[in-house]
From Swiss-Prot:
Species, as recorded: Aspergillus clavatus (strain ATCC 1007 / CBS 513.65 / DSM 816 / NCTC 3887 / NRRL 1 / QM 1276 / 107)
Family listed: Belongs to the DEAD box helicase family. MRH4 subfamily.
Compartment list: Mitochondrion
Molecular functions (GO terms): ATP binding; ATP hydrolysis activity; RNA binding; RNA helicase activity
SUPFAM superfamilies named in the record: P-loop containing nucleoside triphosphate hydrolases
Domain notes from UniProt: The Q motif is unique to and characteristic of the DEAD box family of RNA helicases and controls ATP binding and hydrolysis.
Record field: catalytic activity: ATP + H2O = ADP + phosphate + H(+)
Protein name: ATP-dependent RNA helicase mrh4, mitochondrial
Residues annotated as binding ATP: 207-214
Residue ranges constituting the Helicase ATP-binding domain according to the UniProt record: 194-406
């Protein structure tokens, strides 16, 4: 109540009701604080603040000793080695971390040829057989150990292998020449039978590329021809004596009833041995080898192909003096044999060089027809190849089950002296441009120095011209790639089945003939020219502005070709092969890279790999080359 005696209302607090309720909830009541203090005493203490009840108990394992760590002088004055009886075993986790576990080892050791097994094209040769052959031919070190005629043996160094300091037989020559000579029977008479079984000796010579297979079959064939020639001369001499006696008796008995004698059958167009090859280029190459031996051994040889004129073919076949050894292609020989029935009547030796090609679908009917026509007089059928495809292996097992296979230890293996590099064209700076990558590789090889040491006077001579082969899969791309390389300043030419015969001969001559070593006169002439051509001091040479591109790659020649030159062509002058496309099969790999490493020389191969190419196949081929193992 106030002084006036009236009731007064309490004054409002300055805070609102919401704030008052908030403060009441935040401030605990007295009974809540008392309860929380009581429960705090019953809480469990933190483990780190309490000791374990087992602290005072002794250890259960009494034999366990504390590991002693040797001090700095622990190794002094020791009388016995302190070596643990059993090594410490590592846990599985430690083995997995280090990668030494058996499971990891089994995962890493994958088979060598996984991708190649899916496209197996070659017939396998057991490694046990390879090792046995290697031990068998180890004792043969010279051509003098072969039972060849002296005139044939003396012609090897002078005609077959001129310019070599040391002449030793290669593995296929050590293996094949004794077998072909051992079974040789020049006086063997043909057996006439009605069945289809062959009654002549059959041989298969299989060796790696560039191993001297041509000489391996050519020397026994030449030896057999000369022995048969000597036997024929003796028979002719006896026949002439008998005819002379008969003529005298007839003259005595019936002087006026003499019948005219028939002229003797001429040897014109009747070769003793025939060598079949698949291409005209191989005809020229093998024909040169056969002709070289004829200079000293004295026999008549000839070669016929589609590159020659009909008049020249007729003069070669039907020469009055006859012909002993003929080199030809199957289709041309079969077409001539249809009009000349006596052409194949005297053949005793038939050689199928590059047999895997001559017995495929395109050549098999013609080749089989020739074999059947020469069968009555045939003594030896010799098949020669660098690869044994599965198709050829099945054909031989079916048609010639008794054939004698002479295979070298390194069959189907690319020589280890050949290095294979891989260029990914999808990366910068090519970005999928295969032709640009090819040109860049050629420029890199052309600008690099020559790794071979030519001799002490090589600096006075002109630099060697590098020869490079580029293989493409399609015939149409050969001209396109060659034109692109020419636009980049590279001396490139294309060679395919569409090229003319004259162009093929000119181009192949540059890539197959290795330049001979310089003579002393050439070295002296080069020294004189170097002195005269030395520039005058302090005088700059005059520059000539020539039209066109001035950026040219010197001392480098490139041949863009197909598989036309991958079979049997003896490219001794080539040291680099570029595979513009990845080959379809391992057979193409072997033949294309087989243009390198011939006769013990080194080589380098480069394969261009794109996005759609089988990189796993290239990888396995490269690993097989590094290990020296045979491809499959």
């Amino acid at each position: 109540m106030n002084r006036l005696g009236r009731m007064s209302l309490p004054l409002r607090s300055p805070a609102c009701l919401i704030c008052q309720t908030r403060t009441t909830t935040l401030i605990p009541s007295s009974w809540q604080t008392a309860r929380s203090m009581a429960t705090a005493r019953l809480r469990r203490k933190v483990s780190r603040m309490a000791l374990s009840p087992d602290v005072a108990k002794p250890s259960l394992n009494k034999d366990r000793k504390k590991r002693e760590r040797p001090g700095p002088f622990a190794a002094m004055n020791q009388t016995e080695a302190r070596i643990r009886d059993t090594p410490r075993t590592r846990s599985q986790a430690a083995l997995k971390r280090s990668g030494d576990s058996k499971e990891e080892a089994q995962k890493k050791e994958s088979p060598l040829y996984k991708a190649l097994k899916m496209q197996t094209t070659l017939a396998p040769v057991p490694y046990g057989k390879r090792t046995a052959v290697k031990a068998k031919i180890a004792d043969i070190t010279s051509f003098d150990q072969f039972p060849l005629l002296p005139v044939v043996r003396n012609s090897i160094v002078s005609q077959a292998l001129p310019g070599l300091m040391e002449v030793t037989p290669t593995p296929i020559q050590r293996l094949a020449i004794p077998k072909l000579l051992e079974e040789s029977k020049p006086d063997k008479k043909p057996v006439k039978t009605d069945d289809d079984e062959p009654h002549y000796d059959q041989f298969l010579l299989a060796a790696e590329t560039g191993s001297g297979k041509t000489l391996a079959y050519l020397l026994p064939v030449v030896d057999a021809v000369k022995r048969a020639e000597a036997v024929d001369k003796e028979l002719e001499k006896k026949e002439e004596e008998e005819k002379a006696r008969e003529r005298e008796e007839k003259m005595k008995n019936k002087a006026f009833d003499i019948e005219p004698e028939l002229p003797p059958l001429s040897n014109a167009g009747r070769p003793r041995a025939i060598i079949l090859v698949p291409t005209s280029e191989l005809v020229a190459q093998v024909g040169v080898k056969v002709k070289a031996l004829s200079h000293t051994v004295k026999y008549r040889s000839g070669m016929i192909s589609s590159n020659l004129t009909p008049r020249r073919i007729k003069n070669t076949l039907f020469h009055p003096d006859g012909i002993d050894i003929l080199v030809a292609t199957p289709h041309l020989l079969a077409s001539i044999a249809k009009t000349e029935p006596y052409l194949l009547s005297r053949v005793s030796h038939l050689v199928l060089d590059e047999a895997d090609s001559l017995l495929d679908r395109s050549f098999a009917p013609t080749t089989t027809e020739i074999i059947s026509k020469v069968a009555p007089s045939l003594q030896k059928l010799i098949l020669c190849s660098a690869t044994i495809p599965r198709s050829l292996d099945n054909l031989l097992r079916k048609r010639y089950p008794d054939i004698k296979r002479l295979t070298t230890p390194n069959l189907h293996a690319i020589p280890r002296r050949v290095q294979l590099g891989v260029v990914d064209i999808e990366k910068d700076p090519y970005r999928g441009n295969r032709s640009l990558a090819c040109a860049d590789v050629i420029w890199s090889i052309g600008k690099a120095g020559d790794s071979e040491v030519s001799g002490p006077y090589s600096s006075f001579l002109e630099p060697k011209t590098k020869k490079i082969l580029v293989f493409v899969n399609e015939r149409e791309e050969a001209d396109e790639v060659a034109q692109f390389l020419q636009s980049k300043g590279i001396d490139a030419h294309s060679l395919s089945r569409d090229s003319s015969a004259r162009k093929q001969e000119e181009i192949l001559a540059e890539f197959t003939e290795a330049p001979p070593p310089p003579s002393p006169d050439e070295i002296m002439l080069a020294q004189k020219q170097r002195r005269h051509e030395d520039p005058i001091p302090f005088e700059m040479p005059k520059r000539t502005n020539s039209g066109g591109s001035t950026r040219r790659l010197p001392n480098t020649k490139v041949l863009v070709t197909t598989d036309l030159t991958s079979r049997g062509i003896d490219t001794l002058a080539v040291k680099t092969v570029i595979l513009y496309h990845v080959p379809h099969t391992t057979i193409d790999f072997i033949h294309r890279l087989g243009r390198l490493g011939r006769m013990g020389k080194r080589g380098r191969g480069v394969v261009l790999v794109g996005k759609k190419d089988r990189k796993d196949v290239v990888k396995e081929v490269r690993e097989g080359m590094f290990r020296g193992q045979a491809l499959i």
